[in-house]
């Protein structure tokens, strides 16, 4: 490419310096002495920006892929159904246990009710008035009432 250069005297002179457009063209040159340093700097910066943009794009792709991988954890789609199953099983177990305990309580209650009824019947039988026995007990209590209370309590069976 042809360039015009200003000399110190202020005249324009025709200058023929090679001006490569890419780094590959710059690499094909035999010598870098004829190439302006600003052109070299511009080409290097341009290529560096391209490489940085490619690296950044690859890094963004990698980060988005990692984000998708974290979201697509194999167990995550089964977590909610497993929690629901766990809660359902726990509920069934609690209801079953409550029904079993209620049945045991009812069975124990019926056995105790029959035992209480039997004891009440026995108590009624024992408390029924018996003519011969009551007269003897009444006589004994009248005789025993003349003694002090502590003698009746402590020595009632020894006489």
Curated annotation (Swiss-Prot):
Name of protein: Inner membrane assembly complex subunit 17
GO BP annotations listed: mitochondrial proton-transporting ATP synthase complex assembly
Membrane disposition: Single-pass membrane protein
Coiled-coil ranges from the UniProt annotation: 102-124
Function in brief: Component of the INA complex (INAC) that promotes the biogenesis of mitochondrial F(1)F(0)-ATP synthase. INAC facilitates the assembly of the peripheral stalk and promotes the assembly of the catalytic F(1)-domain with the membrane-embedded F(0)-domain.
Mitochondrial matrix compartment spans: 19-77
Locations listed in the record: Mitochondrion inner membrane
Organism this protein belongs to: Eremothecium gossypii (strain ATCC 10895 / CBS 109.51 / FGSC 9923 / NRRL Y-1056)
Transit peptide: 1-18
Family assignment from sequence similarity: Belongs to the INA17 family.
Assembly description: Component of the inner membrane assembly (INA) complex, composed of INA17 and INA22. Interacts with a subset of F(1)F(0)-ATP synthase subunits of the F(1)-domain and the peripheral stalk.
Transmembrane segments: 78-95
Top-level taxon of the source organism: Eukaryota
Topological domain spans for side Mitochondrial intermembrane: 96-159
Listed GO CC annotations: INA complex; mitochondrial inner membrane assembly complex
Keywords: Chaperone, Coiled coil, Membrane, Mitochondrion, Mitochondrion inner membrane, Transit peptide, Transmembrane, Transmembrane helix
Lineage, broadest ranks: Eukaryota, Fungi, Dikarya, Ascomycota, Saccharomycotina
